[in-house]
């Protein structure tokens, strides 16, 4: 998952101008009217060779909670808690204001890394304000001009170590050699989960229910969540990092630039997650976009849990559950046996089952099987259903071993692997799922010829000529 930087500050200090410079396009509406950016806006930032996610927040305004400014302040505080670091922007020409002092105190108490930037510092007009910024107690301020691009090199030097540290800490351990160490969930390496689905399926509401806090903006409007931001917490004493992704719409409907970026970030969340929770709407499950999302998670080799939301308002629960199981089996055969859990994000019912399903599928995703057990199993499978004999030449399956975990991957050494039908490979994969209790887990199976490792495979056979035979015989006699 990419490093996330939240840009915060009073209205009209240049946050949106800086955001636009970082993303290289005008995504945030820029105006001289304070408070013109009223929501979180996210983009894929490029700064020199650095790549990260940047959030443009609403202005930090000292106002009562019932006003629009109060809502903006609460939302900004959430963005700060969700981001990896905060870029606090003040106006060097205006100097430090009362609101700057109040919110500098909020940022210090957050415990998150804060970079102080004095914007509009070009020329002599900003020098006094630049010196004044030291009084905020957030360290040495960076002198920037978002409008003219000044100070960007200094910003690169400050952000680089933060981004590199976050990248090494967050990346999910996948495609691990079977000889590697067992996966141990710790606070430094929490279980990484992505919650994905169509817009308005209830992803943010579900996460708020899980973590017990109203940390994500929710509402009836589809697409209200525009970013994929990770929240670290403990769920039943298990350290987890959960990503709430923007709703993945059909491509034809993804027209806004922001939504395109959000969907892209959602896809990255899937790639960096260990377990992907595909959230369906009970009223309209298994639309084509749902199937694409689940298929993407399987192709990326992630453990998958299917969660059906809004179960509290489903009138025909028993029949609907039966239809869901049939639909899952028919439409997603590659995820045969994946956990299917019914939940209500609104009431919290079913969360205990969801937690159990996540833990079980994660353990299965890390399954290791000894070579001895695998070869005993392979012999039984061959006896029950021998491989075909295309052209009268029977394919021999000689040996099997596990090559990796996360997801489980196996290699079968055989003769003529190119002639083995796909149906027989599916027979083996389905057998692995059933006999080793790996339902719903992506399984990788590779057929290899023993000749693949033969260094002399493509060499021409050398036939000695009569002259060479004569010379060799002569050399032998001389010896």
UniProtKB/Swiss-Prot annotation:
GTP 1 binds at residues 9-16, 56-60, 119-122. It holds the Pfam family KH_dom-like. GO terms for biological process: ribosome biogenesis. Transmembrane segments: none annotated. Keywords: GTP-binding, Nucleotide-binding, Repeat, Ribosome biogenesis. One of its GO terms (molecular function) is GTP binding. GTP 2 binds at residues 197-204, 244-248, 309-312. Residues 367-453 form the KH-like domain. Residues 457-472 have a biased composition (Basic residues). Residues 449-479 are annotated as: Disordered. SUPFAM superfamilies: P-loop containing nucleoside triphosphate hydrolases. Associates with the 50S ribosomal subunit. GTPase that plays an essential role in the late steps of ribosome biogenesis. HAMAP family: GTPase_Der. This is GTPase Der. It comes from Jannaschia sp. (strain CCS1).
């Amino acid at each position: 998952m990419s490093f996330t930087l939240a840009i915060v500050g009073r209205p009209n200090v240049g946050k949106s101008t800086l955001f636009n410079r970082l993303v290289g396009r005008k995504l945030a509406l820029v105006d001289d009217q304070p408070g013109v950016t009223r929501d979180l806006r996210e983009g894929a930032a490029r700064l020199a060779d650095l790549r990260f996610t940047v959030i443009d927040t609403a202005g930090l305004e000292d106002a009562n909670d019932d006003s629009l400014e109060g809502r903006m302040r609460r939302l900004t505080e959430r963005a700060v808690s969700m981001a990896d670091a905060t870029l606090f922007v003040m106006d060097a020409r205006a100097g430090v204001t009362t609101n700057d002092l109040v919110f500098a105190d909020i940022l210090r108490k957050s415990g998150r890394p804060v970079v102080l930037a004095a914007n509009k510092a070009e020329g002599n007009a900003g020098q006094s304000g630049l010196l004044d910024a030291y009084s905020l107690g957030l360290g040495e301020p960076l002198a920037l001009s978002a409008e003219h691009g000044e100070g960007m090199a200094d910003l690169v030097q400050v952000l680089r170590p933060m981004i590199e540290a976050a990248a090494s800490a967050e990346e999910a351990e996948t495609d691990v050699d079977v000889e590697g160490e067992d996966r141990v969930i710790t606070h430094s390496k929490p279980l990484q989960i992505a919650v994905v689905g169509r817009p308005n399926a209830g992803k943010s509401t579900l996460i708020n229910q899980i973590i017990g806090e109203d940390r994500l903006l929710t509402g009836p409007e589809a697409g209200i969540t525009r970013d994929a931001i990770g929240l670290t917490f403990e769920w039943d004493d298990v350290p987890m990092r959960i990503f709430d992704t923007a709703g993945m719409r059909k491509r034809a409907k993804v027209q806004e630039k922001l939504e395109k970026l959000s969907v892209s970030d959602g896809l990255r969340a899937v790639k960096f997650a260990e377990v992907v929770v595909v959230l369906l709407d009970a009223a309209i499950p298994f639309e084509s976009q749902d199937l694409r999302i689940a298929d993407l998670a399987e192709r990326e080799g992630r453990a998958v849990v299917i969660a059906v939301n809004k179960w509290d308002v489903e009138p025909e629960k028993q029949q609907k559950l039966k239809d869901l199981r049939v639909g899952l089996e028919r439409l997603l055969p590659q995820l045969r046996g994946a956990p299917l859990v019914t939940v209500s994000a609104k009431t919290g019912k079913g969360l205990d089952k969801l937690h159990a399903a996540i833990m079980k599928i994660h353990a299965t995703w890390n399954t290791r099987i000894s070579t001895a057990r695998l070869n005993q199993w392979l012999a039984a499978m061959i006896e029950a259903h021998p491989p075909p004999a295309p052209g009268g030449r029977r394919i021999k399956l000689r040996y099997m071993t596990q090559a990796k975990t996360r997801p489980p991957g196996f290699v079968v050494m055989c003769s003529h692997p190119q002639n083995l039908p796909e149906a027989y490979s599916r027979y083996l994969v389905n057998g692995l799922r059933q006999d080793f209790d790996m339902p719903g887990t992506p399984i990788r199976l590779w057929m290899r010829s023993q000749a693949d490792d033969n260094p002399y495979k493509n060499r021409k056979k050398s036939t000695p000529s009569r002259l060479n035979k004569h010379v060799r015989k002569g050399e032998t006699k001389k010896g």
